[in-house]
Amino acid sequence: MRRKLTALLLFFTLLLSGCCYAPGNERASFVESWLKLPALPMEDYQSTKEHHNEEAETPSTPNESVTIEVPVVNLDEMPKREPGDFVKLRDYIPDIVVELKYATSSNFTGQVVYDFTEVYLRYSTVLKLMDVQAELRELGYRLKVWDAFRPLTAQEKLWNAKPDPQYVSNPWTGTNSHSRGNTIDVTLVNAEGREVEMPTGFDDFSTYADRDYSDCTDAAAANAMLLQEIMEKHGFKGLQTEWWHYTENTDYDIEKIFDPGTVSIWRAECNEYINLRVSPNVSAEVLTTIPDNNQFTVLGWINGFAYIDYQGTRGYVNADYMSRVE
């Protein structure tokens, strides 16, 4: 009602001032339109959470008095990576907010699904998210991550808890986008780190979570559409049934080796050196050698070999010639 009254007042003001509107040939982007929307008073909001008999949250808007400090990340000073390499997200976007729901029991399964608290994604995915975060900062927002890469063991736990392919991918026959390392579940927070109002909470399996946006408040719809436009602009595609779910447009195979829960520091234990090979086979091509007692990071295990990162080079070493440091 207040929006209609505002519109009528604006109309008469323009009429009295002699102003007129000539439609342009180009359609303004949603971001531009969203920034021009007048703020509505709190009593005009009605949260979709009332459908679930929950207390409505206060919608959050950018606070111009709060400045988002932009972290300096120089890619030239970072280890050289290939597009498909797994990297730690906060190494590249230090100010991103992380709250991995499946690292706790605060999720629809009621149990801890995986035992790591850092976000790991493909390098190409992270580069695109850097662009997303940069644009959001200009609007007074940041990304908050609820879920990202899931090992197949984690996907199996989710499937066992809710074996419905509309909401959870079958780990053995489904697309498993989260197990490919190019998919992320996100929402928006303001400069102070508070979540903005969205159509639903995370992992809501009702139709209120889809991208229709007609069954939620204007504020929730505007925030979800803002997130969607910026994510799509930088190379992501959303899942129709989940407003928070986005997949990078570069496709990858399902990752069957890397597991962030097994990441640990080891050292070579041999007479002189061990071979870092391109595949888990004793006759595979040698990428480089690792001198005795030198340390490396174990990323996963397969058939008696460790998949490791040694000074930016990734490959496989025989697990018989190494010992754990931490």
Briefly describe each language-model feature range:
Residues 261-275, 288-292, 299-302, 323-326:
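SH3-family beta-barrel domains
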Residues 280-285:
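Short alpha-helix capping/helix-loop boundary micro-motifs
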Residues 311-322:
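A short macromolecule-binding patch
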Residues 19-146, 160-241, 247-264:
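Extracytoplasmic cell-surface/polysaccharide-interacting catalytic and binding patches
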Residues 154:
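Short, well-ordered surface patches within globular domains
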Residues 2-24:
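Sec-dependent N-terminal signal peptides of Gram-positive bacterial secreted proteins and lipoproteins
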Residues 306-310:
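SH3/SH3-like beta-barrel fold
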Residues 151:
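Segments that shape or occlude catalytic/ligand-binding pockets
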